[in-house]
Amino acid sequence: MKILLCIVLLLVVLTLFAVWPGKRRDALRAPFLGRNCAHRGFFGKDQRPPENSLPAFVAAAKNGYGIELDVQFTADRRIVVFHDDTLDRMTPAKGFVHDMPWAEFSAQPLAGSDEHPPLFADMLRTVAEANPDTPLIVEIKSRSEYNHTYLEELCRATIAELKTYPGPYCIESFDPRVVGIVRRQAPGLLRGQLADSYRSYRKTGAHPVPAFVFSHCLGNFLGRPDFIAWCPEKRNWAVRLCARLGAMMVMWTALPEHDTRKLEAENDAVIFQWYAPKQQYK
């Protein structure tokens, strides 16, 4: 009985160590609290303007919203704003973004429009000109095959470009390794751990073990995130524990069919898509 009790206690301690978020840093949180942030910019279901395009970002900034966006490397290490790992959904091309050089990638039309994928630097400059106070939530894209050196270079380059932006910003990622690297490279920067539900991870083909680890924020010990960005599904016990331990709660992605008032009441910030909420709800 004593051995069993010790095992249970050890598991509790290890779980707490794994999921414990970072210390509250209210000054860093303040620009994001109660804000509605446009997911990949302010765009419609018809992709006019296209997601993650300069017009979508300008529309979000001029309407007073925060902006969520995605960054990754091209083959020649240019930081671009693009969500998918592959090009086929948003462009006529095929293949991975990280395998295509910038000159070829930049020529691809977005969703059949006259717009093209922007460089991160151009996006930052454009938003600063439209509304320099726009809060930015920057998701660093990652894949399991990316090694530590590659991710360190991507994080370092992203952070360097963000330093040119006059407004508030933070970094998030689904990959706890990225959050950990940001913690080491820029400890004074607000950082967040993105998480999806176990069911969603399994639907995309993830093995049960990593699906459980990622959905239950068991990689938080690497980055000690300031916030957890959680999906529309009911929070699991680990996400609820993070909230109780002081993590800022961000919701992604609120859609028109959701109870958006409830989501705003339950979260410190909301990442929305395909509707026009108030800029600030708290």
Question: What feature does the model see in each segment?
Answer:
Residues 2-282:
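Phosphate-group recognition and catalysis centered on beta-loop-alpha active-site segments
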